[in-house]
């Protein structure tokens, strides 16, 4: 499951923990949602929260990410995210953000492997204007050369900052370069620097015309709202927008070949003083039934102060300054990723060895029922806590809507609470195999 936020309820009282534990199989706390599809194929989803805060979040989700790019044109989905805040038929470049700030809202966007997401967080009084702004960018984006060229340099600088000059950013990028050899997951959403510097406006317009269409988008409104009003205003602003191409949205055809052995890469980088390791294993795609158990393993192994990685590598053995795990849950064949940064004089190979040792312990069944019960209690506490925020609820729904798997979201909580120790042991043995591993060492 896409985790609702990095927030962890470390200060949760014992009374609340007991209460949650006692009602482990209580009713679903997931807020109800309503959905309509406009004549142009745009899906509109409303998730009313009965919190009387007056706060809403308006999202526009495009079913496109770096997964939809091709070799030589990497990073275009992310570039379009930047250009979407430039000029339109009726707005000057930067005016979108200025209008949002004037009515007291906050706007931003993100691009991942599988989704591009734009949002405005504001008061319910600004629902109409927020939808109007998003309809303007969807239907009337200019994409001009004099805006494209400077923004391309902004993105190149972002690549230097987040990837080239960041040890963990470089490690992350090189991991995907190594784990995937054919599929577009071979690169992360920022793309390769050479591609960034050689995009043309023609490339951008072609990508935009394919994927930024109403039939490939979802409008999601969460918070203190009335669903009927959401649908009426969405129809008012979006239904007149035309799809640019009546053909079906193209889907990536590049299927990653089956990995037939362990992969290892060593990266040496100037300015790196401590050693790092990224270790990952191929796991099934987003909708697979084992994803819930993999999520639980991610919590057990590498999330929070009591996780196995934190306890062993950071606190007990003092080998790492930080260590964590992440179940990526990508739309196509995915990865379960571990990253650890070594303390002075600690070799990356030693970090890898310790992570593998913990996995072998897990595969032998050395996890207790008490540990699993704690995972369930903490997961449910996180879940309930995040339902208080329109932003967190929007994030929760976004991935499942784009994957057309809202039933998966509905079932998730029950499936997590039904997990058995044997489920975690089975999944660990199924996927944490050396032949399916990719290891990248980052060294000075």
Curated annotation (Swiss-Prot):
What exactly does this protein do? Virulence factor that cleaves the cytoplasmic domain of the human junctional adhesion molecule A (JAM-A), compromising gastric epithelial barrier function and cell-cell adhesion. Cleavage of JAM-A occurs after Ala-285 or, to a lesser extent, before Ala-285.
Keyword list, A-Z: Hydrolase, Metal-binding, Metalloprotease, Protease, Secreted, Signal, Virulence, Zinc
User: Source taxonomy lineage?
Assistant: Bacteria, Pseudomonadati, Campylobacterota, Epsilonproteobacteria, Campylobacterales
PANTHER family (alphabetical): METALLOPROTEASE, MITOCHONDRIAL-PROCESSING PEPTIDASE SUBUNIT ALPHA
The protein's name: Zinc protease PqqE
| Amino-acid positions noted as binding Zn(2+) in the UniProt annotation, renumbered to this chain | 78, 82, 158
- What follows loss of this gene? Essential, it cannot be deleted.
- Could you tell me which Pfam families the record lists for this protein? Peptidase_M16 (PF00675), Peptidase_M16_C (PF05193)
Q: Where is the active site?
A: 81
* GO terms, molecular function: metal ion binding; metalloendopeptidase activity
Q: Which GO terms describe its biological process?
A: proteolysis
Q: Where in the cell is it found?
A: Secreted
Q: Which EC number(s) does UniProt give?
A: 3.4.24.-
Q: Which Gene3D superfamilies match?
A: Metalloenzyme, LuxS/M16 peptidase-like
Cofactor binding: number and manner: Binds 1 zinc ion per subunit.
The UniProt activity regulation field reads: Can function alone, but full activity requires the presence of the non-peptidase homolog YmxG.
The family this protein is said to belong to = Belongs to the peptidase M16 family.
Signal sequence, renumbered to the chain: 1-28
Q: Which cofactor does it need?
A: Zn(2+)
Gene Ontology cellular component list: extracellular region
Please name the PROSITE patterns in this protein's record.
INSULINASE
């Amino acid at each position: 499951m896409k985790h609702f936020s990095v927030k962890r309820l470390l200060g949760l009282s014992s009374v609340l923990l007991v209460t949650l534990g006692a009602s482990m199989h209580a009713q679903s706390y997931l807020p109800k949602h309503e959905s309509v599809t406009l004549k142009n194929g745009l899906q509109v989803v409303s998730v009313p929260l009965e919190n009387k805060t007056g706060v809403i979040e308006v999202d526009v989700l495009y079913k496109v990410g770096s997964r939809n790019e091709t070799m030589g044109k990497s990073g275009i989905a992310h570039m379009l995210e930047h250009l979407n805040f430039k000029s339109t038929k009726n707005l000057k470049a930067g005016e979108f953000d200025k209008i949002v700030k004037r009515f007291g809202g906050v706007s931003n966007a993100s691009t991942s492997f599988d989704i591009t997401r734009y949002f405005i967080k504001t008061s319910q009084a600004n629902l109409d204007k927020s939808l109007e702004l998003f309809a303007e960018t969807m239907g009337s984006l200019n994409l001009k050369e004099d805006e494209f060229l400077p923004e391309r340099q902004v993105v190149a600088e972002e690549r230097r900052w987040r990837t080239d000059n960041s040890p963990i950013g470089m490690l992350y990028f090189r991991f995907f370069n190594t784990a995937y050899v054919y599929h577009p997951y071979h690169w992360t959403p920022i793309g390769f620097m050479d591609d960034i510097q050689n995009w043309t406006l023609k490339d951008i317009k072609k990508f935009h015309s394919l994927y930024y269409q109403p039939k490939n988008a979802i409008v999601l409104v969460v918070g203190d709202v009335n669903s009927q009003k959401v649908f009426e205003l969405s129809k008012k602003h979006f239904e007149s927008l035309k799809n640019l191409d009546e053909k079906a949205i193209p889907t990536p055809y590049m299927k990653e070949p089956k990995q037939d052995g362990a992969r290892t890469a060593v990266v040496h980088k100037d300015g790196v003083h401590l050693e790092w390791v990224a270790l990952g294993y191929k796991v099934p795609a987003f909708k697979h039934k084992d994803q819930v158990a993999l999520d639980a393993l991610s919590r057990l192994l590498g999330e929070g102060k009591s996780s196995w990685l934190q306890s062993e590598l950071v606190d007990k053995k003092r080998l790492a300054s930080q260590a964590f795990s992440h179940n990526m849950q990508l739309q196509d064949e995915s990865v379960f990723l571990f990253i650890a940064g070594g303390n002075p004089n600690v070799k990356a190979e030693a970090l890898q060895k310790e992570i593998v040792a913990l996995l072998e312990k897990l595969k032998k069944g050395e996890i207790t029922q008490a540990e699993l019960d704690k995972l369930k209690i903490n997961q449910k506490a996180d879940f309930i806590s995040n339902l208080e925020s329109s932003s967190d609820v929007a994030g929760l729904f976004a991935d499942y809507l784009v994957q057309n798997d809202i039933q998966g979201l509905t079932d998730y909580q029950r499936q997590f609470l039904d997990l058995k120790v044997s489920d975690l042991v089975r999944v660990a043995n199924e996927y944490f195999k050396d032949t399916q591993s990719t290891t990248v060492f980052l060294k000075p």
